Amino acid sequence: MLEMLMQWYRRRFSDPEAIALLVILVAGFGIIFFFSGLLAPLLVAIVLAYLLEWPTVRLQSIGCSRRWATSIVLVVFVGILLLMAFVVLPIAWQQGIYLIRDMPGMLNKLSDFAATLPRRYPALMDAGIIDAMAENMRSRMLTMGDSVVKISLASLVGLLTIAVYLVLVPLMVFFLLKDKEQMLNAVRRVLPRNRGLAGQVWKEMNQQITNYIRGKVLEMIVVGIATWLGFLLFGLNYSLLLAVLVGFSVLIPYIGAFVVTIPVVGVALFQFGAGTEFWSCFAVYLIIQALDGNLLVPVLFSEAVNLHPLVIILSVVIFGGLWGFWGVFFAIPLATLIKAVIHAWPDGQIAQE
């Protein structure tokens, strides 16, 4: 048994390039695992740098210097963010306040509807269980106000951190874009010399991460706008807020779409009732989700589609548990990285001979 393990070890780990790749991966995972909180602004800056690299290169191709191309792209990007912050965010925030205000009425309607179930289906529903659920719901509503106050006070503590990030992140993005080659050369100098295999994996993953980040942003925008227009067509309350939530839900494959469907169905059901308008609105929402999953995602993420849905869900759960939001956001690239490493890893036949 021990001899078999030794043979397996020699086959898989006799190549110096494989050892170098393993060291780089373990070091990278360890740094992110232990210092993810401290590295949050850097991770945001790296994501934005990947996103803005394409327009920067395009401006360079028409004669702009790297410095000027970076400056122009960053100014335009910040301008778009400010426009969204002053136009979209206040409306979505106001709709969120209205939703919280109307939630007790919605829950009361749900409680009244649930109270009729034991009379309609006495064999399936117990009145005592329904009453207990209604009482539990009322008690939660009474404590909701205190929870909102506590969250508000806690959020005040994070305002300083957010203010610092708003200054640091654009500066980091600027220097990551402007001095990209110098920084990559500096990283190469500290890596092991036998890094041919690592370079092969990096070249493949670098392009995939670029496509993934650009694709995710485009998917969020397309799905969010399409959902908003669909909800506006039916005059659904809180349409912009719900559309923003649906847009952000694409960051979490499968799970996000399932979770965000709950408030969409709840709001539509309480506004329209279980009538034709509700089912028409819900059908439009399902069509948008189907087009996203079966048309938009295959076009934007052709490589990721090769991953089995169970692998994607497990990746979201595992990496999300390890690194929170960033683990969820990069679940598909990380799963693709593991797949690329497995495929690129030496099979050991040369070493055996």
UniProtKB/Swiss-Prot annotation:
Designated gene of the protein: perM
Q: What is its main location?
A: membrane
Keyword Coiled coil tagged? no
Report keywords, A-Z. Cell membrane, Membrane, Transmembrane, Transmembrane helix, Transport
Name of this protein = Putative permease PerM
Gene Ontology CC: plasma membrane
List this protein's GO terms for biological process: transmembrane transport
Bilayer-crossing residues are: 19-39, 72-92, 156-176, 217-237, 240-260, 281-301, 310-330
The way this protein sits in the membrane is described as: Multi-pass membrane protein
Where on the tree of life does the source sit, at the highest rank? Bacteria
Q: Does this UniProt record's set of keywords contain Transmembrane helix?
A: yes
UniProt lists the family membership as follows: Belongs to the autoinducer-2 exporter (AI-2E) (TC 2.A.86) family.
InterPro entries named among the record's database cross-references? AI-2E-like
Subcellular location per UniProt equals: Cell membrane
